[in-house]
From Swiss-Prot:
Its EC number is 2.5.1.7. Cell wall formation. Adds enolpyruvyl to UDP-N-acetylglucosamine. Its main location: cytoplasm. Pathway: Cell wall biogenesis; peptidoglycan biosynthesis. NCBIfam families: murA, PRK09369.1. It is found in: Cytoplasm. GO terms for biological process: cell division; cell wall organization; peptidoglycan biosynthetic process; regulation of cell shape; UDP-N-acetylgalactosamine biosynthetic process. Belongs to the EPSP synthase family. MurA subfamily. One of its GO terms (cellular component) is cytoplasm. It comes from Mycobacterium tuberculosis (strain ATCC 25618 / H37Rv). It comes from the Bacteria. This is UDP-N-acetylglucosamine 1-carboxyvinyltransferase.
Length: 418
């Protein structure tokens, strides 16, 4: 049954919140366990819908998956199946990350084109091109990515764009290829570094993680391991932006602030007081936020996943902000819902110009994806009256205990069955 959130605006948020493991990391780590026969253990798994969905994908490939709280125990078989069917894959985008491990381990893969968030075109061209350079035949056939290889051999691979997904799929195939693979213009996101750390624990030889050039020396086989997922920087930043919007005071634990330096700098520019430790940060906002300009870019730039929250912040800031989207072209669909809440915003190509108002007005709004949903809830926190946020299953895919955490911070929000 469909559910919605009812958010009553006007409360100042304060307190402490701890974030769990990163959604953008755990799903790739789960897929990587297919590379080694035996049982791998992943800890600090977030309580989000996409984790059991990925578990179903892996079970369909012959793995045994046990989810126990924040622990996932995954036993990969000696001969995994190579066909990830549409029923399991269609529900979320990250399911395509089994492509690289299957090509690496089975030398063949058939993965249905994935579903997921409606934030614009995210083609698999770079994934396919990279796998072809490693020696695989890779094409789209009947709605599936189909790859076959006699052997995989290392190659020099130049990515047109530092795509996270392409970097990860190429990486997970290259770790068991013959010879040396170099990925130029590789994605530098902390989630990619986390994957490299786990692969090296499994016996891979990956150098340069977190830099634009990654070197992978292939090994014959990998072994199972135990690994702890890094903290979710996107969830953590969402709480920091919530503090700034509500003129609140929130301490966020369980995340490395080094993964969020540009975001925290922007919050400082908006007038917040930001303090940091090795594994936490605190955002305190006393006055109305100041307008700031934001341009999304691959890491270490401002994350595209936080663009909706940046627009929500700009909508009540003092002044006019320009938000530029350089990653996903359709992410500005969110602006239409913000206008329903009274925001003074307009889009022009990949720019959104937002003139801040003292307060938004409540209205029914609809989530189109995980981050847009979170942005709408933050907007509801500063709107006059009760805002109804619909299609909140999107939010549940990326934010563990979202309502419970908001309530603990002083928000007035409830989940209602429609």
């Amino acid at each position: 049954m469909a559910e919605r959130f009812v958010v009553t605006g006007g409360n100042r948020l304060s307190g402490e919140v701890a974030v769990g493991g990163a959604k953008n990391s755990v799903l790739k780590l789960m897929a990587a366990t297919l590379l080694a026969e035996g049982t791998s253990t992943i800890t600090n798994c977030p309580d989000i819908l996409d984790v059991p969905l990925m578990a179903e994908v892996l079970r369909g490939l012959g793995a045994t998956v046990e989810l126990d709280g924040d622990v996932a125990r995954i036993t990969a078989p000696d001969e995994p199946k190579y066909d990830a069917d549409f029923a399991a894959v269609r529900q979320f985008r990250a399911s395509v990350c089994v492509l690289g491990p299957l090509v690496g381990r089975c030398k063949r893969a058939r993965v249905a084109l994935p579903g997921g968030d409606a934030i614009g075109s995210r083609p698999l061209d770079m994934h396919q091109a990279g796998l072809r350079q490693l020696g695989a035949h890779c094409n789209i056939e009947h709605g599936c990515v189909v790859a076959r290889a006699e052997t995989l051999r290392g190659a020099e691979i130049q990515l047109e764009f530092p795509s996270v997904g392409a970097t990860e799929n190429i990486l997970m195939a290259a770790v068991v290829a013959e010879g040396v693979t170099t990925i130029h213009n590789a994605a530098r996101e902390p989630d990619v570094v986390d994957l490299c750390t786990m692969l090296n624990q499994m016996g891979a030889q990956v150098e340069g993680a977190g830099s634009p050039t990654m070197t992978i020396t292939g090994v014959p086989r990998l072994h199972p391991t135990e690994h702890r997922v890094i903290g979710d920087r996107i969830v953590a930043a969402t709480w920091g932006i919530a503090a700034a919007m509500t003129r609140g005071d929130i301490s966020v634990a369980g995340v490395d602030p080094a993964h969020l330096q540009l975001v925290l700098h922007k919050l400082h520019d908006a007038g917040a007081t930001v303090t940091q430790t090795d594994a936490s940060f605190r955002v305190t906002q006393y006055e109305r936020p100041k307008a700031v300009n934001v341009a999304t870019l691959p890491f270490p730039g401002f994350p595209t996943d936080l663009q909706p929250m940046a627009i929500a912040l700009a909508s009540i800031a003092d002044g006019t902000s320009m938000i530029t989207e350089n990653v996903f072209e359709a992410r500005f669909r969110f602006v239409e819902e913000m206008i329903r809440l009274g925001a003074d915003a307009r889009t022009d190509g990949h720019h959104a110009v937002v003139r801040g108002l003292p307060q938004l007005s409540s209205a029914p709004v609809w989530c189109s994806d995980i981050r847009a949903g979170a942005g709408l809830v933050l907007a509801g926190l500063v709107a006059d009256g009760d805002t109804e946020v619909h299609d909140v299953f999107h939010i549940d895919r990326g934010y563990p205990l979202f309502v419970e955490n908001l309530v603990s911070l002083g928000a007035e929000i409830e989940r209602v069955c429609c």
